[in-house]
Amino acid sequence: MKNKDYPLRSSMDELSTKNDNEIDLEKGPLPEYNSEDGSTLPPYSEIWKYIKTVSEDSSTGPTEIANPNVERRQEFKDSHPNIYSLLRLLISVLAVIVVFFTAWVCVNPLEKSIFGKVAFSVTIGITCPIVFIAIFCFFETWTQAVAQCIKVTVIFLAQCVKVTAISLAQCVKVTAVFLAKCVKVTAVFLAKCVKVIAVGLYNSKKDLVVTIWLAWVVICFILFGCVKDGRLNLNKALICSTCSISAALFFILLLVCIPIWTLKHMLFGLFQVLGVQSCVVIVTKGLMYLFDKHIDATGYEIEASSLFVIGNFLFFYEMERPGALKRMPKFIGNGIASFLGGLGNAFGGIGNAFGGIGNAIGRIGNAFRGANDNNDIPLGEMDVESEV
């Protein structure tokens, strides 16, 4: 049996081989196609034709986007050339007039010498035509420049306003947060201070009394300093003392941890001290009214200082020994009774002393009387007695 060999290439392969071997004489040999980078395409392919068409269209078309303002100005110029020229002339003339009057006002050539007037005329004569030509011939250029400058300025100002508003908002926000934190920290600090002071005063009653007394003294000195510039009388002294004690008690009321019995004790001592001071003031004013006497400023200060010292002493003594002011009338009565009893005993002793002196004098008289009796005996009786 005879083996037959059949070719493995198809008709498509033969066609492609034929096309590859054939060379178009008009178009020339095909360039080699680099399939790696894809930058080179066959010049006769459909893709190459499309790219070439698009590039030609883009090269012949406009490269810039037309400005609407420029288009409108160009349409107005084409449709109304006379009006456009008249407008250019009017703006140029107005610019020249503005330059001329500005120079006239600033220089004022009428007050200058002849040389100054000539120099002004020459300068204006050269400047005004230059301004007129520059504005009239380059009208479109400088109008576009001015419009662009205005646009850039407006955008810049808008950006500045925006940035400033954002910065102010951030500053306000940061400031508000900072102030809120400051208030919070201050409130917490004051609360802790009040708590520490209240707990300390609650745990130490004696320190509480000393603290109250010192605070009261400081407040009294402040009040006396405030009223020192005016005329100080007894009423003001009583008011100062009352306000000082009230301020001290208000300081205590702020410390809410103090027991109620301590507050009750303080109020009771306050009213007792005020009662004693009121009695002193009433008695003093009554005596001054009866004797029609007037105290000068130094006397008022002495009286106020006395009330201040008495009030401090009584309040401090009442806080140290509860009930001392309540027992004071009885103590004063016992003291007066003891004083009067001592006076009576003293006068009795004096009377007894005078009685002893009288007895001694009587004995002396009796002695003198006995001596006189012995001198009256007769001489015969004396001789008989001697013989016996």
Curated annotation (Swiss-Prot):
One short Pfam name that applies is: WTF
- In what ranges is there compositional bias, type Basic and acidic residues? 1-29
Tell me which Gene Ontology terms the entry assigns under biological process.
meiotic drive
Q: Which InterPro entries match?
A: WTF
Q: Which UniProt keywords apply?
A: Cytoplasm, Endoplasmic reticulum, Membrane, Toxin, Transmembrane, Transmembrane helix, Vacuole
Q: Does the keyword Glycosyltransferase apply?
A: no
Transmembrane region(s): 89-109, 119-139, 152-172, 182-202, 207-227, 243-263, 267-287, 297-317, 331-351
Cellular component terms (Gene Ontology): ascus epiplasm; cytoplasm; endoplasmic reticulum membrane; vacuolar membrane
**The protein's role, per its UniProt record:** Promotes unequal transmission of alleles from the parental zygote to progeny spores by acting as poison/antidote system where the poison and antidote proteins are produced from the same locus; the poison component is trans-acting and targets all spores within an ascus whereas the antidote component is spore-specific, leading to poisoning of all progeny that do not inherit the allele.
How does the annotation summarize its subunit structure? Homomer. Forms protein aggregates. The two isoforms can interact with each other and with themselves. High sequence similarity is required for their interaction.
Name the UniProt record assigns to this protein = Meiotic driver wtf13
| Originating species | Schizosaccharomyces pombe (strain 972 / ATCC 24843)
Designated gene of the protein: wtf13
